[in-house]
Amino acid sequence: MKFLPIIIFYLFLFLYSVEFLSFSFVEIDSINHFPFLKNILHLSSDLFGKNDYALRFPSLFTGFLSVVIFYNIAKLKLKTKREIIYTTYIFMLIPGMIISSVIVNKSVYLIFLSLLFIYSYEKFRNFSYILLILYVFVDKSLISLYLALIFYSIYKRDTKLLIFSLILLAFNANYFEYKIHGRPKGYFLDLFGTYFLIFSPFIFVYFLYALYKNIFYKKDLIYFISATAFFVSLILSFRQKIKIDDYAPYTLGFVVNMVNVFLKSYKVRLPRFRTFYKILFVVLFTSLIMLDISLFFNKYTPAKKLSYSFYFPKNLAEILKKEKIYSMSCNNEKLSEILEFYGIKKGDKYKLIYSKNKNSVSIFHKNKIILKINVSKLNTI
């Protein structure tokens, strides 16, 4: 029964994503740049057919497994059952965790892999080394994990782990031809804005505070993984625009350390001096819930620059089918792939012109426009 609320929450996310979200441009990019994800989706399509259920299930199931593993990590780090349960719920409700679970992207898989390694390292040390070897071939972003292990092994004075991590880092960097590129240009504020969205503003501020405060406590593997990923992304942002899904997934596990920092400050004080921390918890948790709610109602907001493509393609396909248009050519390859997913095949009889700047779609037949649709209005159907 302890996992029942988690099951209910992820069932809600599954039904929500199938009902309201469309296969999007962002997800097309994610699939094309992460072969591992493409293979998973092919397997899901073979099992469930080519539909939204098959599209959303793998990410959401992986998200659910990540929460379960996090719960087991929390059991190793916290003392009471109440602390463990609340910490797990906080992790589950982090906006970045929700977003990565409902959207087809690599983030949720990286969260799962990092948490699986952390738990394995604590409980099944030899198995964790096997995981590290396998991770070399998964994605280039795992270089952050290997770099964190180098720092951790130096801190623990573990020569064998240091050499092992250096070798795996070299293999990973070589296999994916890891490069630092781009002209020097500051994306520092953009990065911070993204982290604000991932954690929620107040939680992210506390994340920074906990990173600092954890320096004075005994540092564990979670601290090194989260701190390394965060500071590497920070340093690189001064030079180039980074892909946040290469770094942010490794920071979410730090939630358990954030709670530990909070509890240590709370418990050392007498009951009459704990009022500030009770208020702080209410403020942090309320801000988290409010941002979560805004995510689900995002479809109905006037400006959707970040998320507009998650809503209109499915509705567009339905409109085309009502107009008895089942095949067409399209000036946008990504939109063409999405429409094909929803049953609109490629053909020459009709032509679709998509204008991102004007938020419009125009349908032509024999060089004559027969239908024009405002994409922004499709978002609120």
Regions found by a protein language model. Name each.
Residues 99-107:
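Short acidic/glycine- and proline-prone juxtamembrane loop motifs at membrane-interface regions
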